[in-house]
Amino acid sequence: MQSCRVQCALTLLSLALAINSISAAPTDPRLRQFLQKSLASAGKQELAKYFLAELLSEPSQTDNEALESDDLPRGAEQDEVRLELERSANSSPALAPRERKAGCKNFFWKTFTSC
């Protein structure tokens, strides 16, 4: 019984030392700097999308009379603003799909394809 306790204590002590030595291992500062830069650029874009999603999910404030319009019904205006925000969040100039008219033809590698 005594040897089992001693063996368990030694095992836990060795595991604690192994974990401590792994976490205290030196890291390359260039690698850390590269990872921070890449995460910062991706993080800003993800953070902006997150905040935009939060804004879209919040119910509109009916207390604010400055935003109310007499021209459009309240629901239609909210839908229009929401669609515009979603389009601006999801669109990027390099990846925006081309809008084509119905029935147009596209010449691709010696053949015509419909759009």
Swiss-Prot record:
BP terms from Gene Ontology: regulation of cell migration
Gene that this sequence comes from: sst1
Subcellular location field: Secreted
Alphabetical list of InterPro entries matching this protein: Somatostatin, Somatostatin/Cortistatin_C
Keywords from the named record: Cleavage on pair of basic residues, Disulfide bond, Hormone, Secreted, Signal
Recorded superkingdom: Eukaryota
Disulfide bonds: C104-C115
Annotated source species: Pelophylax ridibundus (Marsh frog)
Protein name: Somatostatin-1
Signal peptide bounds: 1-24
MF annotations from Gene Ontology: hormone activity
Coiled-coil stretches noted in the UniProt entry, renumbered to this chain: none
Pfam families the UniProt entry points to: Somatostatin
Disordered, as annotated region: 60-79
UniProt similarity note: Belongs to the somatostatin family.
Stated role: Somatostatin inhibits the release of somatotropin.
GO CC annotations, alphabetized: extracellular space
